Curated annotation (Swiss-Prot):
Primary gene name: dnaK
Record-level Gene Ontology MF annotations: ATP binding; ATP-dependent protein folding chaperone; unfolded protein binding
Functional description taken from the UniProt entry: Acts as a chaperone.
InterPro entries: ATPase_NBD, Chaperone_DnaK, Heat_shock_70_CS, HSP70_C_sf, HSP70_peptide-bd_sf, Hsp_70_fam
The keyword Transcription is assigned to this record: no
Protein name, per record: Chaperone protein DnaK
Keywords, alphabetical: ATP-binding, Chaperone, Nucleotide-binding, Phosphoprotein, Stress response
HAMAP family: DnaK (MF_00332)
Highest classification ranks of the organism: Bacteria, Bacillati, Bacillota, Clostridia, Eubacteriales
Species: Clostridium perfringens (strain 13 / Type A)
Listed Low complexity bias regions: 589-606
NCBIfam families: PRK00290.1, prok_dnaK
């Protein structure tokens, strides 16, 4: 069986590894390095350069050199080179082809399969684009796994006998992720994850670029960012300065002949201190700390629960980042893994699991947002909560909202808000062929299935007839990082408002149910109720109808209470007439058996809830 390679397709650098002798081994590229710059360059003669050789000539060929293409994955962004448009998938495929060729040269055999890592907060479009890039490069992508999870595999492979709770802080060139995992007995279980797919080392570089450019503009009146060749030199100088400041307290930025004007050539000769760099990037570091707080909160994990902190990604070499993580967690970050290589090594381990070379290892990831359906009143009823371990299956019993309803529409939503309209619609489908019955009688089981690849399948089954309908949603995480962050933040900001709106809808639903049940029972009782009693109850019913659609919740509750009390008097009298025990009146809201109605099958089935379904006539 041919080897499956593990690839870390990074924003600034990429890495490839493979399992050998039960251990992950990083493959050295044709230039003798263990990582490859994620850079592609097109030459005037049509030649295409990838990696370090492409990066070296970027200054002299800025228009035809592409960097950080990962930030555009899953978008309609195009790169135009000599009149031809290239998609991010195509550019990424060129990088993957280079890694594939290096792996084949090392192994001495053809490589056709790979496990590729992505940021934990990559959405479905970005993940699919990564798979497409692999396919373009001639690779069958057997699995897409999250970068922090892959790093934990590399860290924990030799620690499977003891239980650990680890926090993985992954700050790469273009993305940031944090994941909290439980490690033990060969199981790597993600507890929670959070991140920002638009935050990374490139942003730190940009702060230095802007600082140099603004200083030069103030002195010379020229904005170097408008000159592509000068800008490329600034980028290289900024990256070099950032790296040097990780080991030195200051660095010299010397760029002779950066530009020229009527007075002659201009040069840059300035000193950048680590203190100034920290000042320029303080807010970026703070953003990562806030994301860590969110990950801990959503996973119900305290800092005292964390046994180890792992730093992943080249940008974690920045002293201010290390210091911030240490100060926040109270723990010295582990130096047991190479931040540039551990993700590729983890991908290789997962590849080994797939081929059977690695045994007794189970990787359990999570779904990033809550999945549910819309029910009566527009409420989002959750079936699978965010940070639920996948694969997973959850089901719940729902019922109809109208008499003789023969079909229902299932509206699948994703998000943290309590109202369906405030969440993301994933899909809709219809279950037809329901046997006609009073509302609340049919039992419809709605089930959610998520496999290890994050693909969602939702099914609805009529328990009486066995009729089934389903939908497969491949875009289960089809949200940008901004949309996910927004969904969670809005859920917190509007939690109280959502709670009040949900309570109001529940009260209105109860009012409607009370009216329906009372009218139905009153009609069934017929002449057993006197005209005077019937008139009093009907007056109370009209009062509930009059207020139930308004915004005065207390008025609705009062009208419902008055109606219930009026009906109690009648029911108590009827029980006494029929030999029943005094005081054992019945509640029109709580009747099972033959009188069961709106949204409930009987009192013993706690899984039955009101569902907002549309009535559709059978053709």
């Amino acid at each position: 069986m041919s080897k499956i390679i593990g690839i870390d397709l990074g924003t600034t650098n990429s890495c490839v590894a493979v399992m050998e002798g039960g251990e992950p081994v990083v493959i050295t590229n044709s230039e003798g390095a263990r990582t490859t710059p994620s850079v592609v360059s097109f030459q005037a003669n049509g030649e295409r350069l990838v990696g370090q050789v492409a990066k070296r000539q970027a200054i002299t060929n800025p228009d035809k050199t592409i960097m950080s293409i990962k930030r555009h994955m899953g978008t309609d962004y195009k790169v135009n080179i000599d009149g031809k448009d290239y998609t991010p998938q195509e550019i990424s495929a060129m990088i993957l082809q280079k890694l594939k060729a290096d792996a084949e040269a090392y192994l001495g055999e053809k490589v056709t399969e790979a496990v590729i890592t992505v940021p934990a907060y990559f959405n479905d479009a970005e993940r699919q684009a990564t798979k497409d890039a692999g396919r373009i490069a001639g690779l069958d992508v057997k699995r897409i796994i999250n970068e922090p999870t892959a790093a934990s595999l590399a860290y924990g492979l030799d620690k499977m006998d003891s239980a650990h709770k680890i926090l993985v802080y992954d700050l790469g060139g273009g993305t940031f992720d944090v994941s909290i995992l439980d490690l033990g007995d060969g199981v790597f279980e993600v507890v929670s994850t959070n991140g920002d797919a638009r935050l990374g080392g490139d942003d730190f570089d940009q702060r230095i670029i802007d600082y140099i450019a603004e200083d030069f503009k103030a002195q010379n009146g020229i904005d170097l960012r408008q000159d592509k060749m000068a800008l490329q030199r600034l980028k290289e100088a900024a990256e070099k300065a950032k790296i040097e400041l990780s080991s030195s307290t200051q660095t010299l930025i010397n760029l002779p002949f950066i530009t020229a004007d009527a007075t002659g050539p201009k040069h840059i000769d300035m000193t950048l201190t680590r203190a100034k760099f920290n000042e320029l990037t303080h807010d970026l570091v703070e953003r990562t700390i806030n994301i860590m707080k969110e990950a801990l909160k959503s996973g119900n994990v305290s800092l005292n629960d964390i046994d180890k902190v792992i730093l992943v990604g080249g940008s974690t070499r920045i002293p201010a980042v290390q210091e911030a993580v240490k100060n926040f967690t109270g723990k010295e970050p582990s130096k047991g893994v190479n931040p540039d290589e551990c993700v590729a090594m983890g991908a290789a381990i997962q590849a080994g699991v797939l081929t059977g070379d690695v045994k007794d290892v189970l990787l359990l990831d999570v779904t990033p947002l809550t999945l549910g359906i819309e029910t009566l009143g527009g409420v989002a009823t959750p079936l699978i909560e965010r940070n639920t371990t996948i694969p997973a299956r959850k089901s719940q019993i729902f019922s109809t909202a109208a008499d003789n309803q023969t079909s229902v529409e299932i509206h699948v939503v994703q998000g943290e808000r309590q109202m369906a309209a405030d969440n993301k619609t994933l899909g809709r489908f219809t279950l037809s062929g329901i046997a006609p019955a009073p509302r609340g009688i049919p039992q419809i089981e709605v089930a959610f299935d998520i496999d290890a690849n994050g693909i969602v399948k939702v099914s609805a089954t009529d328990k009486a007839t066995g009729k089934e309908a389903n939908i497969t949603i491949t875009a289960s995480t089809n949200l940008s990082d901004a949309e996910i962050d927004k969904a969670v933040k809005e859920a917190e900001q509007f939690a109280e408002e959502d709670k009040k709106r949900k309570e109001a809808i529940e009260v209105k639903n109860n009012a409607e149910q009370t009216v329906y049940q009372t009218e139905k029972t009153l009609n069934e009782l017929g002449d057993k109720v006197s005209a005077e009693e019937k008139s009093e109850i009907e007056a109370k019913i009209e009062e509930v109808k009059k207020v139930k659609d308004g915004d005065d919740i207390e008025a609705i509750k009062k009208a419902m209470e008055d109606l219930t009390q009026a009906f109690y008097k009648v029911s108590e009298k009827l029980y006494q007439q029929n030999g029943g025990a005094q005081g054992q009146g019945f509640d029109p809201n709580n009747m099972g058996g033959a009188n069961a109605g709106a949204g409930a099958t009987n009192n013993n089935d706690d899984n039955v809830v009101d569902a907002d379904f549309e009535v559709q006539d059978d053709k």
